[in-house]
């Protein structure tokens, strides 16, 4: 099964977890990266394809937002915004990227802190769409190891397959 969206490294997780290693990246996308785009400066982020930023041990704990009936994680949100700032400084344009999360409260928290052209939305709301860069905020971090929406394989497949050139996943390992 040939896919035409994402770099081979981004595709690898989804192929292994959901498609029994049946996905193949077309030659036109398998090696593409942010550094192929003019005026993007090489950095540790822009030179990568798939990054997992583990927040275990940071004290970034989820909280319940009663107003939105949803979860949020302030520390993780600050980290995602810092990562976005690093990408923007390296020349990544806001309309090339999106910040997504399974949780509406986290989406709201992020949306209030980014430039207007940087899209912020839920995983479900982003289904069928793609961007050059996706920053995925997983939110869940608690002492009992509860993962909530993260156990929904369909949602996680959608979340992990929206990026074309760079996927940054931020969460508690």
Could you tell me what each predicted segment is?
Residues 1-6, 13, 19, 83, ...:
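C-terminal accessory regions
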Residues 6-9, 59-61, 105-109, 127, ...:
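Flexible loop/turn segments at secondary-structure boundaries
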Residues 10, 80, 99, 128, ...:
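Residue-level signature of catalytic and energy-coupling elements of molecular machines
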Residues 18-25:
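Proline-centered turn/helix-capping motifs that create local helix->coil transitions or kinks
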Residues 25-112:
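Conserved helicase/translocase motor-coupling segment
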Residues 26, 53-55, 100-102, 121-123, ...:
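Generic beta-strand/beta-sheet core signal
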Residues 96-98, 132-133, 166-168:
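Beta-sheet entry/capping signal
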Residues 111-145, 150:
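Conserved motor-coupling elements within RecA-like helicase/translocase cores
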């Amino acid at each position: 099964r040939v896919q035409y969206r994402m770099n081979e490294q981004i595709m690898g997780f989804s192929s292994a977890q959901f498609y029994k290693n049946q996905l193949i990246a077309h030659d036109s996308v398998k090696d593409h990266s942010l550094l192929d785009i003019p005026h993007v400066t090489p950095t540790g982020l822009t030179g990568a394809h798939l990054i997992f930023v583990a927040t275990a041990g940071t004290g970034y704990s989820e909280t319940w937002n009663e107003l939105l009936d949803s979860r949020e994680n302030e520390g993780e949100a600050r980290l995602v915004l810092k990562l976005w700032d690093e990408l923007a400084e390296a020349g990544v344009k806001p309309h090339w990227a999106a910040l997504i999360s399974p949780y509406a409260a986290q989406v709201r928290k992020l949306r209030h802190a980014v430039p207007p052209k940087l899209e912020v939305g839920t995983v479900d709301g982003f289904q069928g769409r793609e961007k050059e860069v996706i920053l995925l905020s997983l939110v869940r971090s608690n002492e009992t190891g509860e993962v909530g929406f993260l156990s929904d394989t369909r949602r996680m497949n959608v979340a992990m397959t929206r990026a074309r050139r760079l996927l940054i996943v931020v969460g508690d390992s």
